[in-house]
C-alpha cells in the first residue's frame, strides 16, 4: 500500500478535504492521511511514500525532517532542498531573468546585528547605505516586508522616508525588502500543479480573508489571462515547484 501524508499547520479545511478526495477515488493500493510524525532517525524512512508539505516554512524541525525523508525514499512536495534555498528576493531576481514583470525591489541588511555579530562583522558593507539612490529607485508609496516568509507578517506600507526609518527601526534582526507599490486594476491568485496545470482565480487582497476570492467574477480578455497563465508556468518551471500559488497584481 502506497501511503500519502499531508503535513500542515493551523489551516483547518484543505488538509482533510485533500485526504477525503484522494481516498474517495479508491485508487488501488493508494491511501492518504493526515501525516503523523514521531521518532525521526537519521537516514531512516518515516513511513510515507509521498509527503505534501504545507507548513515547513514556519517550522525548522519539519524542514530538517523532510530533507531526511527525501533522501530516505519519500517523494516530498515541494522539494525541501530547493525550498531551503528559496526566498522572496531571489524569486523576484529570478523573475527578472525569465521575463516575468515584478515590482522594483531592493534587499536591505537587518536593522540590528544578527546574534553573535557586531560592527566588525560588517566591514564589507557601505555605511551609510545610499539611501537617496534606493528611495529614488523604488519611489513612494512603497511596501516594506521580510525577504523570506509569508502570511503578511511584518508588512508595512510607507509613504515617505520618515515612515521608512520608523518602520526600519522596528524590524530588529529581520532582513527586509523595500518594494515599489503597484496600483492594480486586476489581481489574480493562481494555483499551479505539476508545473503544467494552472487555475486562475480573481482575488482581492484588500478584503477580509473570507471575501478575497471574487464571487461571480467579470469576464476578462483572453490575452490578459494567457499572460497570467504563461507567467505562472514560467515561474514554477524555473523554481521547480510541483505545487505552488502565484499572485499577480496588474
Give the role of each language-model region.
Residues 2-8, 70-73, 81-188, 217-230:
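Active-site nucleotide/adenylate-binding loops and adjacent lid/helix of ATP-dependent enzymes
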Residues 51, 143, 245:
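Generic enzyme active-site microenvironment
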Residues 167, 177-179, 187-204, 245-246:
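Beta-strand scaffold of nucleotide-dependent catalytic cores
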Residues 157, 192, 248-250:
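Conserved hydrophobic "DFG−1" position in protein kinase catalytic cores
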Residues 209-250:
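A long amphipathic alpha-helix within ATP-dependent nucleotide-binding catalytic cores
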Residues 100, 195, 240-243:
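Coil-to-beta-strand transition motifs
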Residues 11-13, 57-58, 83, 148-150, ...:
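Short, solvent-exposed loop/turn segments at secondary-structure junctions
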Residues 9-121:
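Conserved N-proximal alpha/beta basic substrate-recognition cap immediately N-terminal to
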Amino acid at each position: 500500500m502506497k501511503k500519502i501524508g499531508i503535513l500542515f499547520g493551523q489551516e483547518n479545511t484543505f488538509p482533510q478535504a485533500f485526504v477525503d478526495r484522494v481516498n474517495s477515488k479508491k485508487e488501488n493500493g493508494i491511501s492518504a492521511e493526515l501525516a503523523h510524525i514521531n521518532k525521526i532517525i537519521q537516514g531512516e524512512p518515516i513511513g510515507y511514500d509521498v509527503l505534501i508539505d504545507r507548513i515547513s516554512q514556519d517550522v525548522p524541525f519539519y524542514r530538517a525532517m523532510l530533507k531526511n525523508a527525501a533522501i530516505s525514499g519519500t517523494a516530498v512536495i515541494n522539494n525541501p532542498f530547493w525550498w531551503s534555498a528559496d526566498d522572496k528576493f531571489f524569486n523576484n531576481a529570478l523573475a527578472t531573468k525569465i521575463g516575468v514583470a515584478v515590482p522594483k525591489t531592493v534587499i536591505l541588511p537587518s536593522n540590528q546585528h544578527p546574534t553573535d555579530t557586531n560592527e566588525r562583522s560588517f566591514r564589507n558593507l557601505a555605511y551609510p547605505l545610499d539611501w537617496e539612490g534606493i528611495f529614488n529607485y523604488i519611489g513612494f508609496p512603497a511596501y516594506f516586508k521580510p525577504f523570506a516568509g509569508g502570511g503578511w507578517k511584518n508588512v508595512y506600507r510607507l509613504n515617505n522616508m520618515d515612515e521608512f526609518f520608523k518602520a526600519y527601526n522596528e524590524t530588529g534582526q529581520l532582513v527586509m525588502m523595500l518594494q515599489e507599490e503597484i496600483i492594480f486594476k486586476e489581481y489574480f491568485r493562481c494555483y499551479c500543479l505539476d508545473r503544467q496545470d494552472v487555475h486562475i482565480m480573481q482575488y482581492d487582497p484588500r478584503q477580509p480573508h473570507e471575501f478575497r476570492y471574487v464571487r461571480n467574477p467579470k469576464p476578462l480578455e483572453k490575452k490578459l489571462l494567457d499572460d497570467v497563465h504563461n507567467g505562472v508556468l514560467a515561474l514554477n518551471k524555473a523554481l521547480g515547484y510541483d505545487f505552488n500559488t502565484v499572485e499577480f497584481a496588474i
